[in-house]
Amino acid sequence: MASTPSLLRLALLLLGAVGRAGPRPQGTTVSLSETVQKWREYRRQCQRFLTEAPLLATGLFCNRTFDDYACWPDGPPGSFVNVSCPWYLPWASSVLQGHVYRFCTAEGLWLHKDNSSLPWRDLSECEESKRGERNFPEEQLLSLYIIYTVGYALSFSALVIASAILVGFRHLHCTRNYIHLNLFASFILRALSVFIKDAALKWMYSTAAQQHQWDGLLSYQDSLGCRLVFLLMQYCVAANYYWLLVEGVYLYTLLAFSVFSEQRIFKLYLSIGWGVPLLFVIPWGIVKYLYEDEGCWTRNSNMNYWLIIRLPILFAIGVNFLIFIRVICIVVSKLKANLMCKTDIKCRLAKSTLTLIPLLGTHEVIFAFVMDEHARGTLRFIKLFTELSFTSFQGLMVAILYCFVNNEVQMEFRKCWERWRLEHLNIQRDCSMKPLKCPTSSVSSGATVGSSVYAATCQSSYS
């Protein structure tokens, strides 16, 4: 008996890919639970056939069997045996004329795969990819999965380190860096939610499928915990977009207004970044529960419900893009006011533009208004590749630009290095003196003086 139904695994892969990539086109109505229920009915009919069908004449023949994919009759030795594509497949209507094949050897045994205990099967006529343009080969989906998993892992690690740096250095505590820290937190939560979501999908569409734990799989899909995982992911993604919007608004405020209350405006930013996403994620969850309570909420049969989340995110992307254009105009005017040559202006403008793109998420505009139900074939793959690759590595770029290459952060590290070197030299110099001429109190005294001078220097540099 085969350990995993290959075509059913492709069906689950399709559902899993949709859960990772976004909403499902409205025309697709087959859910995982429906597929499993049809598979169970197919298995029941097959077991009845295996029991009631008359046996072949005496002699060698391959035994009838159900291999968790198709129902096979007795096979004459030395011949191919074919049966119609199983009708429980989500795409069965498009492969009505197709067949799946096995080979019965002359010894009366089903042919097995090389170096495997699994029987050989030819499923080419029943494969869903024959339908053409809507879905992608498993290799392409796997490559996308690897790319964004690596991206989120690198971003998560870099953002945790960057957050520790901004929190650890007292002189870096200011409104601007508090906003950066909240942006880092939103990227970290987004990465964590993606990891948790992928772990849930891996169990549902891989482990449970391979072990045929259909009851456990369906009960998990219908559980509150599974839905909360995807609801949390939607909130983390939305909060990330709105903290990017906060960064854009704060940058524009610095350039356009000379005087404003940072403490008061920071409270407003907190409300926008963490509060506004609740205003549309919670209603979306309520609508899903009332009108589209299917499975684990990984797919959207009615795209109008998905717009409850999509439109506010498009609004944030659009506003940030307008801020990006406005900031570039301000940068150009300031560069021209400094009477710089055209070459220098172009170089600095290019540098500013490339820096602002990841910081404001401007790349999202490329495919932001190409709805998932309208993207097909190559366009959909390009859209998925662009969004998943850029978004997953965006946190890494933000950590680098806002922290690792920041002049203030580098200055703090240089001061720490200088202080450590000064204290180390004092200890070496004191230890080289004779004990009778150098009391132990002078060591602490010298270190205190060095530290106080460093502290005064730090305070003056930040005053």
UniProtKB/Swiss-Prot annotation:
It is a multi-pass membrane protein. It is found in: Cell membrane. Residues 165-175, 252-265, 329-348, 405-463 are cytoplasmic. Detected in pancreatic islets (at protein level). Detected in pancreatic islets and lungs. The modification ADP-ribosylcysteine is found at C341. N-glycosylation enhances cell surface expression and lengthens receptor half-life by preventing degradation in the ER. Selective recognition of glucagon-like peptide over glucagon is determined by residues located at the C-terminal end of the glucagon-like peptide. G-protein coupled receptor for glucagon-like peptide 1 (GLP-1). Ligand binding triggers activation of a signaling cascade that leads to the activation of adenylyl cyclase and increased intracellular cAMP levels. Plays a role in regulating insulin secretion in response to GLP-1. This is Glucagon-like peptide 1 receptor. It comes from Mus musculus (Mouse). The lineage of its organism: Eukaryota, Metazoa, Chordata, Craniata, Vertebrata.
